[in-house]
From Swiss-Prot:
<keyword id="KW-0813">Transport</keyword>
<comment type="similarity">
    <text>Belongs to the SecB family.</text>
</comment>
<comment type="subunit">
    <text>Homotetramer, a dimer of dimers. One homotetramer interacts with 1 SecA dimer.</text>
</comment>
<dbReference type="InterPro" id="IPR035958">
    <property type="entry name" value="SecB-like_sf"/>
</dbReference>
<keyword id="KW-0811">Translocation</keyword>
<dbReference type="GO" id="GO:0051082">
    <property type="term" value="F:unfolded protein binding"/>
</dbReference>
<dbReference type="GO" id="GO:0015031">
    <property type="term" value="P:protein transport"/>
</dbReference>
<dbReference type="GO" id="GO:0005737">
    <property type="term" value="C:cytoplasm"/>
</dbReference>
<dbReference type="GO" id="GO:0006457">
    <property type="term" value="P:protein folding"/>
</dbReference>
<keyword id="KW-0143">Chaperone</keyword>
<protein>
    <recommendedName>
        <fullName>Protein-export protein SecB</fullName>
    </recommendedName>
</protein>
<comment type="function">
    <text>One of the proteins required for the normal export of preproteins out of the cell cytoplasm. It is a molecular chaperone that binds to a subset of precursor proteins, maintaining them in a translocation-competent state. It also specifically binds to its receptor SecA.</text>
</comment>
<dbReference type="GO" id="GO:0051262">
    <property type="term" value="P:protein tetramerization"/>
</dbReference>
<dbReference type="Pfam" id="PF02556">
    <property type="entry name" value="SecB"/>
</dbReference>
<keyword id="KW-0963">Cytoplasm</keyword>
<dbReference type="InterPro" id="IPR003708">
    <property type="entry name" value="SecB"/>
</dbReference>
<keyword id="KW-0653">Protein transport</keyword>
Length: 167
């Protein structure tokens, strides 16, 4: 199996929002229920394919780690029970070298496992800071096993007879 080489060329917050709809009336001392949704998208950046001196192809991709957190509490004084909603799209620009020697599956694994694994700690810190700035204790998301997530998505697609991209 050829060795893949993946490099990051930049990372950034593409979108960030925090809603605190019941402030300053949030008086519940109950711990909120936390619901976390994670999606991963990859977009090939056009016009970035080139031939290196050693005749290797390089492909550039923007990988987006989209995390949405909704905290709810069961309290009669809180409208809709929403304590806060935090959403971020954290992106990285990655290149994959030795592209001609890699299978489509190896490229997908690099994009949907390697990329998000690199980006997650940075997105996690942003969410912790934003929730703290919103008047809540910093929300420290549990680590995510992107390899298991990728495998589960693949099994789900096989059972549905779908070959669509991993999201």
């Amino acid at each position: 199996m050829p060795q893949q080489k993946m490099r990051i060329h930049g990372q950034y917050v593409k979108d960030l929002s925090f809603e605190n709809p019941n402030s300053p009336f949030l008086s519940s001392s109950k711990a909120p229920d936390i619901n976390v949704m994670v999606n991963i998208n990859s977009a090939k950046l056009e016009g970035t394919k080139n031939k290196e001196e050693v005749n290797e192809e390089k492909s550039f991709h923007e990988i987006t780690l989209h995390i949405e957190v909704k905290a709810t509490v069961k309290d009669e004084g809180i409208k809709d029970g929403v304590a806060f909603i935090c959403e971020t799209k954290y992106c990285g620009i990655f290149s994959i070298e030795n592209l001609k020697e890699l299978s489509e599956e190896e490229v997908r694994q690099a994009l949907f496992i390697g990329g998000p694994t690199f980006l997650f700690p940075f997105a996690r810190e942003i969410i912790a800071r934003v929730t703290s700035s919103g008047g809540f204790p910093p929300l420290m998301l549990d680590p995510i096993d992107f390899e298991t997530m990728y495998e589960q998505q693949g099994q789900q697609q096989k059972s549905n007879g779908s070959n669509s991209n991993f999201n």
